[in-house]
Amino acid sequence: MARLIGVDLPRDKRLEVALTYIYGIGRTRATETLKATGISGDLRVHELTDDQLVALRDHIEANYHVEGDLRREVAADIRRKIEIGTYQGRRHRSGLPVRGQRTRTNARTRKGKRKAVAKKKAK
């Protein structure tokens, strides 16, 4: 396994796909990175030379926020919204969907498992 920015890339996958295992890099950024470094996306990870790995690492570190830095930025953005009391911050604090999705039905992932409600007693 080749290691790039603290992530083990799968050996047998195409480089274009393997780069998406890095948090913050999707298919578009992977393609841009390969084009900028002049490396073919059809190469497999185990076929890379050390020079190519260094070129990839240098380009990614110079141009993108990835992995731990990006995770910290996202967490800080959410914390900031909670602290200043925006609508989105209140939704984060309540554990409800943030972007306007309906909650009368659905939203089970965000709300968690259903809570049992007692039936009405018959008279």
Swiss-Prot record:
Molecular functions per Gene Ontology: rRNA binding; structural constituent of ribosome; tRNA binding
Pfam short name (any one): Ribosomal_S13
Residue stretches of biased makeup (Basic residues): 101-123
Superkingdom: Bacteria
Any one annotated GO CC term: cytosol
Record keyword Ribonucleoprotein present: yes
The entry's keywords: Ribonucleoprotein, Ribosomal protein, RNA-binding, rRNA-binding, tRNA-binding
Ranges where the record places region Disordered: 89-123
A GO biological process held by the record: translation
Role summary: Located at the top of the head of the 30S subunit, it contacts several helices of the 16S rRNA. In the 70S ribosome it contacts the 23S rRNA (bridge B1a) and protein L5 of the 50S subunit (bridge B1b), connecting the 2 subunits; these bridges are implicated in subunit movement. Contacts the tRNAs in the A and P-sites.
UniProt similarity note: Belongs to the universal ribosomal protein uS13 family.
Subunit structure: Part of the 30S ribosomal subunit. Forms a loose heterodimer with protein S19. Forms two bridges to the 50S subunit in the 70S ribosome.
Name of this protein: Small ribosomal subunit protein uS13
Gene name of the record: rpsM
